[in-house]
């Protein structure tokens, strides 16, 4: 049984839309938008970021984790 309705709207890259060219690993509030409640990096298909910025985002999140600005894992109880 196929579900009908409106076609899905294409997600827009947050960084392209806001003209952000540099993703700083010290900007924790921005990075938290792209991390799940468990602490995992959200995939492109969920966030809508372009491939270029997803790569930059991944590097920034990993750097922030290494200097203890972000946790590797969030314990949700």
From Swiss-Prot:
InterPro entries: Ribosomal_bS18, Ribosomal_bS18_CS, Ribosomal_bS18_sf. The keyword rRNA-binding applies. PROSITE patterns: RIBOSOMAL_S18 (PS00057). Keywords: Ribonucleoprotein, Ribosomal protein, RNA-binding, rRNA-binding. GO terms for molecular function: small ribosomal subunit rRNA binding; structural constituent of ribosome. Binds as a heterodimer with protein bS6 to the central domain of the 16S rRNA, where it helps stabilize the platform of the 30S subunit. PANTHER family: 30S RIBOSOMAL PROTEIN S18, SMALL RIBOSOMAL SUBUNIT PROTEIN BS18M. Belongs to the bacterial ribosomal protein bS18 family. This is Small ribosomal subunit protein bS18. It comes from Shouchella clausii (strain KSM-K16). The gene is rpsR.
């Amino acid at each position: 049984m196929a579900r009908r309705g409106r076609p899905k709207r294409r997600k827009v890259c947050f960084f392209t839309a806001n003209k952000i060219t540099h993703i700083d690993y010290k900007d924790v509030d921005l990075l938290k938008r792209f991390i799940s409640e468990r602490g995992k990096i959200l995939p492109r298909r969920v966030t809508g970021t372009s491939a270029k910025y997803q790569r930059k985002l991944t590097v920034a999140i990993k750097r922030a984790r290494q200097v203890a600005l972000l946790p590797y894992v969030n314990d949700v109880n």
